[in-house]
A protein has these predicted regions:
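Hydrophobic and amphipathic membrane-targeting/association helices
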Residues: 1-183
Length: 183
């Protein structure tokens, strides 16, 4: 009895002081159209599929391939380097890094003292790419959930979880838009 009471108090205390986690989710149906060979070709080149080996067009639009596209470095990099809004110069990567206290950690390092993603993409160095790759790897493991709620249907769910509601919502929206424009 006493043990249950202590566990209940600890659980309540944990829930009260824990930062909330916000989830932004987009769920949609993958459409397979006819005569979209140009779209098929661009999608195929990214996920490494040889169109000559595919006899059925629907195999290319299998949601498993699209799940991998959502998790690809290229799509996530484009999303992270997007701006928070049209009139705001801050990139999503900067907001994410500030929220995770990564900016402070980077600026403590002498090599990264003046490091910023708020520069033109053409001026970004290998260091930017390396840091972005590390951030993306962690993000995919901890905060990005791409799933098929039902294996029999062509439905896809994209979720972004973060303690910053605005970041979660914006990143989810931007990622879905980028991938949908791509294919």
């Amino acid at each position: 009895m006493l043990g249950s009471l202590v566990i209940a108090i600890l659980r309540i205390t944990y829930e009260v002081f824990r930062d909330p986690i916000y989830t932004a989710e987009t769920t949609f149906i993958i459409e397979v159209g006819e005569g979209d060979m140009s779209q098929l070709g661009s999608l195929a080149s990214v996920v490494g599929i040889n169109l000559n080996n595919i006899s059925d067009e629907s195999q290319l639009f299998d949601t498993d391939h699209i799940v991998e596209l959502y998790k690809s470095y290229r799509m996530l990099k484009l999303a992270f380097l997007s701006r928070l809004s049209d009139d705001d110069s801050e990139r999503l990567i900067t907001r994410f890094a500030r929220g995770k206290k990564l900016l402070k950690r980077w600026h403590r390092d002498d090599e990264l003292k003046n490091f910023s993603f708020e520069i033109p993409e053409a001026d970004m160095s290998v260091k930017h790419d390396s840091i972005l790759m590390e951030v993306i790897d962690d993000f995919k493991k901890e905060q990005l959930i791409i799933a098929k709620p039902n294996r029999k249907l062509m439905i896809l769910s994209v979720k972004v979880e973060d303690d910053d509601a605005l970041f979660a919502e914006k990143f989810n929206t931007v990622l879905v838009k980028i991938v949908n424009q791509f294919y």
